[in-house]
A protein has these predicted regions:
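Short polar/charged helix/loop
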Residues: 1-115
Length: 115
């Protein structure tokens, strides 16, 4: 347990299908913020970073873009439900799309304050 004055880092994992657009955009929003260590991954085999049991174990909280991503992670770890938040963001945005950024900021601010 951290002693008074120590920083507590929250490890956050963002997951989408291909780890190309949605999850990297979300990762960029929190990257560099004090108190967060952030990674992103995809559920598809060809993703730059593929979701794994190791990443699930690393994360304190996992934000998935769609329900299907939650189901894919449950195949890797049946107990992952307790860590997952489904954001409900469909796959029709490009990386750093202003609308995607706005939606992510809105949804993430409910968990982390202003993003």
């Amino acid at each position: 347990m951290p002693k008074g004055g120590e920083d507590v880092t929250k490890r956050v994992l963002f997951v989408c299908s291909g780890n190309i657009d949605r999850s990297p955009t979300a990762e960029a929003l929190l990257r560099g913020r004090k108190g967060f260590e952030v990674k992103s991954a995809g559920t598809l085999a060809g993703a730059p970073t593929v979701a794994s049991k190791q990443l699930i174990d690393w994360a304190d909280i996992i934000f998935v873009m769609e329900e299907k991503h939650k189901e894919a992670l449950k195949l890797l770890d049946e107990n992952v439900d307790r860590k997952i938040v489904v954001l409900g963001i469909d796959d029709h945005y490009l990386k750093s799309d202003p609308e995607l950024t706005r939606i992510l900021k809105d949804k993430l601010s409910k968990h982390f304050g202003k993003v």
